[in-house]
């Protein structure tokens, strides 16, 4: 450790956000760049822990103290080598991960944690800027072929690992471009898509083949996959959204978040001039208080919504870590995202009872009621009903598992009791040679878990194809975040 007193002498400073009145007029990323000297001081706050609990918070097993120290010393090339040793895509996690490593940071027991996420992101951006992110093509090919179905973070991680191991890998994606939720689910103001494209370019040069616009299960059947490939990795995600079947659900103007967000991204990239779901001048209500709801909020603001209200059935979290969620667990606290900084009209402890129409089949308002948690369930507070006028409702209430698609039926893979694709300790499904990685097997989770799943599943596939593997396997299928 280069600065033994850094955590005591240097205060925690996170990157500043661009002014609200400026950033809501464009789709560019929210955060402003910082000087490298500032970054070095932040890296110097990493203390000489006996046991670095930040490792506990990250399923990738990132070597956090090592690359923190290297960045403090200015050894950027060695820092990116240590970072890439455990994480294929630090430019994604450095932007999109909620950083459970920071809530597990030892400094965070009684001080402000090290800005690990900020240091990670700057490490990879310095490497790209200096031309130090190069293709790592295999020395030889094994003659084995692998199909990866789905091009989100789990699928891309599995594909890159298997390609580098010498297998011939094809990644299939039903959307018109590769990237999965990274492409069309994550708004441009959180991650500009050229960030994704430059990594895909590296993967193509390594030998990974991309097949966008292919609906596997229809255009390419499960039988076709079995005949053409020696192994298949299902990385189709948890895309079956949770719905709200209440009176008025059929009214026009009610959409799932993932029906809205892709069009926002296409608009941001200039791929469409007038998206079919456009909230300019309209009143919007978002159901769900999580990250996806915040993404709908930021997108609605940039489209020019007249008002946006976000509803959450849970009570407002506390500002400080609850006593029942001690360090090093990830606490449920009140957070203000960049979108909430732009327009924060959140309502907690409320439930939607009915969608109200205008008599012409269009949405005009929603009927809500205050709730309280009693007898193990949420109960309505009598006399607390009210209406919120709105033209659009976006449901951002999470996902229940992978879609029960024709591909799953064709491959005859079994599902577990939660509706996810069943798998063994080697990430293999109930059908030999068919593996599953990411949310399709785990259930909806964080991007770091998706990448860890992709890396671990790749190791299992490599072992299945060759009888051995040197690929790292950071997690088991049954591993879960530390909870209380």
Give the residues covered by each predicted segment.
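C-terminal catalytic lobe of FAD-dependent flavoproteins
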Residues: 23-37, 41-45, 356, 360-414, ...
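Glycine-rich Rossmann-fold phosphate-binding loop(s) that bind the pyrophosphate
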Residues: 149-153, 288-290, 439
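FAD-site-proximal beta/loop scaffold in flavoenzymes
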Residues: 250-281, 374-444
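Beta1-alpha1 glycine-rich phosphate/pyrophosphate-binding loop at the start
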Residues: 5-32, 61-73, 78-83, 109, ...
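Ferredoxin-type iron-sulfur electron-transfer modules in oxidoreductases and energy-metabolism complexes
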Residues: 23-42, 63-95, 99, 110-140, ...
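Feature captures the FAD/FMN-dependent oxidoreductase FAD-binding
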Residues: 78, 140, 145-149, 197-246, ...
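Short cysteine clusters
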Residues: 46-49, 54, 58, 93-97, ...
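A conserved FAD-binding loop/helix module that cradles the flavin
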Residues: 293-298, 303, 440-471
């Amino acid at each position: 450790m280069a600065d033994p007193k850094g955590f005591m002498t240097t205060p925690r400073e996170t990157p500043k956000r661009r002014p609200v009145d400026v950033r809501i007029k464009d789709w560019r990323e929210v955060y402003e760049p910082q000087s490298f000297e500032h970054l070095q001081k932040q890296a110097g706050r990493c203390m000489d822990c006996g046991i670095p609990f930040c490792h506990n918070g990250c399923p990738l097993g990132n070597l956090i103290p090592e690359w923190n120290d290297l960045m403090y010393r200015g050894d950027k090339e060695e820092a990116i080598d240590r970072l890439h040793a455990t994480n294929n895509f630090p430019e994604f996690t450095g932007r999109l991960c909620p950083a459970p490593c920071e809530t597990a940071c030892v400094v965070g027991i009684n001080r402000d944690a090290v800005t690990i996420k900020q240091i990670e992101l700057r490490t990879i951006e310095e490497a790209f800027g200096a031309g130090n992110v190069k293709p790592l093509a295999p020395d030889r090919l094994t003659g084995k072929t692998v199909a990866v179905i789905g091009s989100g973070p789990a699928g891309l991680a599995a594909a890159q690992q298997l390609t580098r191991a010498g297998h011939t890998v094809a990644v299939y994606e039903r959307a018109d471009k590769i990237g999965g939720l990274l492409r069309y689910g994550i708004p441009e103001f959180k991650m500009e898509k050229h960030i994704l494209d430059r990594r895909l370019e590296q993967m193509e040069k390594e030998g990974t083949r991309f097949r966008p616009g292919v609906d596997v299960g229809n255009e390419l059947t499960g039988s076709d996959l079995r005949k053409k490939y020696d192994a298949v990795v299902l990385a189709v995600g948890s895309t079956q959204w949770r719905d709200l079947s209440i009176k008025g659900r059929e009214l026009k103007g009610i959409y799932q978040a993932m029906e809205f967000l892709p069009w926002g991204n296409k608009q941001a990239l200039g791929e469409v001039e007038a998206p079919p779901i456009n909230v300019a001048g309209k009143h919007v209500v978002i159901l769900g208080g999580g990250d996806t709801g915040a993404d709908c909020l930021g997108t609605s603001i940039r489209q020019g919504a007249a008002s946006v209200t976000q509803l959450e059935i849970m009570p407002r979290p506390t500002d400080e870590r609850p006593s029942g969620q001690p360090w090093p667990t990830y606490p449920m606290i009140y957070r203000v995202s960049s979108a909430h900084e732009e327009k924060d009209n959140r309502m907690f402890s409320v439930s939607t009872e009915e969608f109200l129409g205008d008599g012409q089949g269009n949405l005009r308002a929603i009927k809500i009621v205050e709730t309280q948690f009693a007898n193990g369930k949420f109960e309505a507070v009598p006399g607390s009903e009210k209406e919120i006028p709105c033209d659009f409702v976006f449901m951002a209430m999470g996902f229940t598992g992978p879609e029960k698609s024709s591909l799953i039926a064709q491959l005859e893979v079994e599902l577990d009791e939660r509706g996810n694709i069943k798998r063994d300790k080697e990430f293999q499904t109930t059908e030999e040679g068919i593996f599953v990685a990411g949310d399709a097997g785990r259930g909806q989770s964080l991007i770091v878990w998706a990448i860890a799943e992709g890396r671990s599943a790749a190791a299992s596939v490599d072992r299945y194809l060759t009888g051995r593997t040197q690929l790292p396997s950071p997690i088991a299928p049954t591993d879960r975040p530390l909870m209380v």
